[in-house]
């Protein structure tokens, strides 16, 4: 990556400094026995001390504490024992209205809870999980948050990687950033061809395409709650940049994808059985790692509006 694209000092003083671990030492926050500990210098936090039984909700003060932590850190990893699988919907509901996630290329497997679906490696493993993406970025209004619960996890492998698109923006050279802010990108569910793979019948494929036409969005956008700028492009769904030639568009997108993929702005979550997780789908991108062979991996998932 060109050094011209990286400017480590151009950072928002009100937010944790990117690439500065010292800012995170001793940064634990606690309220009513619930603690937040930074997971890495750039994205994520551990949550400890919260217990949900499916009936008694936490106090409103604790709920707001967790919500603010989610906006600040990008994702929250809840320790095993925080919630049982049957109460996962309660955890998701703390952050908004939970609903079933369904996409045209991967129809949802519905759990007993109509707001929760299952990702089961013994039922289906899809390549799209191993490409950096924002959930449903092909829609005008993707879910605000995504939540997962590890019901069955491999003894090794099967991690989930997260990257912070706001932190990636902060690494841009100011001149390049200003140019990017003038551009618009096209996002399409068919960018990687997964819709064609899912629907072999031409009429059915055409019907699905009609339901999910390409959409346009600013290449650099403001987070609607924090007001911070972020790179809004992802490998799975971003097709091209309007107004540029094919080669120029692809070249510029690769520069942005390199920033998104940079280890400087990402972290890796190793699953344990019973781990629950929620992330801000508007600024945090993710991808799976398919290194667990034939081991069983079963996660519950909900998206939150």
Residue ranges and their predicted role:
Residues 2-276, 282-305:
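Non-heme Fe(II) oxygenase catalytic core, chiefly the N-lobe of the double-stranded beta-helix
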